[in-house]
Amino acid sequence: MRLQVGVLVACLPLLPLFGLSLEEPKEYIFPVYWNVPTFQCHKYGLNFSRVKDWGLQQNYQDEFRGEEIAILYDPGEFPALLPASGGRRIQRNGGVPQEGSLTRHLSLFQGHLEKLIPNVNFSGLAIIDFEHWRPVWRQNWGSLSPYRDFSRLIEKRRHPFWFSSMVEVEATYRYELGARVFLLDTLRLGKKLRPLAKWGYYGFPFCFNYTPYNNRAACSYEVQLDNDNMYWLFSETTAYYPSLYLKYNDMYSTKRQRFIKGRLEEAMRVAQEVPVYPYVWYKYHDNHQFITKEDMVNLLKIPKDYGCKGAVIWGASRDVNSREKCIALQSYLDEVIGPAVKDLHEETFREGISDHEVDENSEEEFDEDDMELKEKILSYDVRDFEV
């Protein structure tokens, strides 16, 4: 008997070669994180303890930043052109990335990080939310166009006799190089200081579907090419946090589903094996009304079906800055968000159990058909195997 056990133990490394497995069933869950500043509601006697009761991942005592998730809003001192009165812009740290002090920014970023995420062993979601400018030159359109204008002005002053085309090339080159250094070194420092966290920038990878620049569900070829060229950043990213914020006007349920799928297809294409946690908001971003139950279900179910590792429900401070708003959100949690998450978890669990039962049945069939092979494995003498 002892010899048989010894031979079996010696043969255990060979079992996967014959399609055999000793793994136990895994826990099947699609985590949904609560990233809403509902701590502001505590002063009204509303502690939002029901969040965890519904199965959402919530920080201890409803802290906005805690052991599960921590978002850093505009941390450090990224260069930026801050809006001021009269349509003016105030330059912060050089205004544009090619003119900023990286040393100053990283020093301040480290201070902010150590204060906001004090636990060096933090292993949750770590999101850097910086939206003043985009690293790809051509993507700074609309309200972000001042970054291109100011960059051109800088080059005109540096090279007063250059043609406009030469100024454009130089401005583009220096801007994108500076943006690359700031974003990449910030991410690397975050990973160095909190190495167990899942680090990424909010909104990336971009898609811009169903916008004036691309009124289709799929991301444009140009944007996909931009994302491919951002390998320098994505190779350091340990989690992706694309935005799935919905709008109400000029959209309908099916179109919103296509919007979600288009963004997720690009995120999954870029991410490969890196986990994706899309950000969803419980309000439409154009009218600020609560989204329908159907839209909430789609915002959670479609990411799960696409292979995302979870989702993040976000909320703004202005959503919970009064007692009335807090009560409204708590009702919405119990009527829409909570049931949607609960149903999703039950569905995910059923699918997981079903898949596991299929695996077990397949293994039983394999056992019956290949009992002779198993017996042959157990009949081997441990001395037949050389190290």
Predicted segments, located by residue:
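Glycoside hydrolase catalytic-domain groove-lining segments
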Residues: 235-285
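Alpha-helical scaffolding within the catalytic cores
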Residues: 55-57, 112, 218-231, 260-267, ...
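N-terminal module-boundary/linker segments of secreted carbohydrate-active enzymes
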Residues: 13-66, 91-99
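N-terminal signal peptide
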Residues: 2-5, 9-29, 346-355, 379-387
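Conserved, mostly hydrophobic/aromatic
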Residues: 128, 240, 303, 311
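Aromatic-rich peripheral "rim/lid" segments of glycoside hydrolase catalytic domains that contact
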Residues: 290, 302, 316-387
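Aromatic-lined carbohydrate-recognition surfaces of secreted/lumenal glycan-active proteins
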Residues: 167-226, 271-285
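A solvent-exposed, charged loop/short amphipathic helix patch at secondary-structure junctions
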Residues: 89-96, 140-176
